[in-house]
A protein has these predicted regions:
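Short S/T/G/P-rich N-terminal loop/turn motif that feeds into the first structured element of a domain
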Residues: 1-38, 42-48, 56-60, 81-93
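Extracellular/luminal beta-rich ligand-recognition
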Residues: 51
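Short, flexible helix/strand-to-coil boundary loops that buttress conserved ligand/catalytic motifs
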Residues: 65
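Conserved short beta-strand edge segments in small beta-sheet-based binding/regulatory domains
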Residues: 71-82
Length: 93
């Protein structure tokens, strides 16, 4: 099974990043084995985070989200790289 990239958009509940950073500091990312963190970007208002994750088992995302859903609302989108998108669309050009 191939690994899939996921763009996870985290919306901090009540626009408050403090509990999220506190939990991450105290307990780490809480990602199950098989779910890999790639990188993340946080908006300058500390209201949301754009996080790139990778796994071959999308159920692991649900397991990970369960650790955070009390303080974060999630959007999860499967994504591909720009290079892969170009490769896939080129036959239609």
């Amino acid at each position: 099974m191939s690994r899939t990239l996921y763009m996870v958009i985290e919306h901090y509940k009540n626009g408050d990043a403090t509990p999220v950073y506190r939990r991450c500091r105290d307990h780490g990312r809480l990602a199950p084995e098989g779910l890999s963190y790639i990188s993340s970007w946080v908006d300058t208002k500390f209201e949301r985070c754009y996080q790139l994750m990778e796994t071959d088992n999308p159920r692991l995302l649900d397991e990970w989200i369960a650790h955070w859903q009390d303080i974060v609302d999630f959007e999860v989108h499967s994504v591909i790289t720009s290079a892969e998108a170009e490769k896939r669309i080129s036959p239609r050009l």
